[in-house]
Each structure stands twice: as structure tokens, then as C-alpha cells.
Amino acid sequence: AKKSVGDLTKADLEGKRVFVRADLNVPLDKEQKXTD
């Protein structure tokens, strides 16, 4: 089942390997600042 980070507890993670996928594809302005 799909969970968000806020749904996880220590018991969910204890003794397990965790893979975190992060989407860093965000729009940037000409000064390289996130615009949205």
C-alpha cells in the first residue's frame, strides 16, 4: 500500500531498508529560484 512520510511510524521502519523517491523537477526563474 502507498503511504506518505507522515503515515510512517518507527514500527513501520524498524529493521527495514527505505527507498525515498523525490521529484526535484521544479520550475526555476532566471535567478535559479523555485517559482512554484
UniProtKB/Swiss-Prot annotation:
GO terms for cellular component: chloroplast. InterPro entries: Phosphoglycerate_kinase_CS (IPR015911), Phosphoglycerate_kinase_N (IPR015824), Phosphoglycerate_kinase_sf (IPR036043). It catalyses: (2R)-3-phosphoglycerate + ATP = (2R)-3-phospho-glyceroyl phosphate + ADP. (2R)-3-phosphoglycerate binds at A22, D23, N25. GO terms for biological process: glycolytic process; reductive pentose-phosphate cycle; rhythmic process. Its EC number is 2.7.2.3. Belongs to the phosphoglycerate kinase family. This is Phosphoglycerate kinase, chloroplastic.
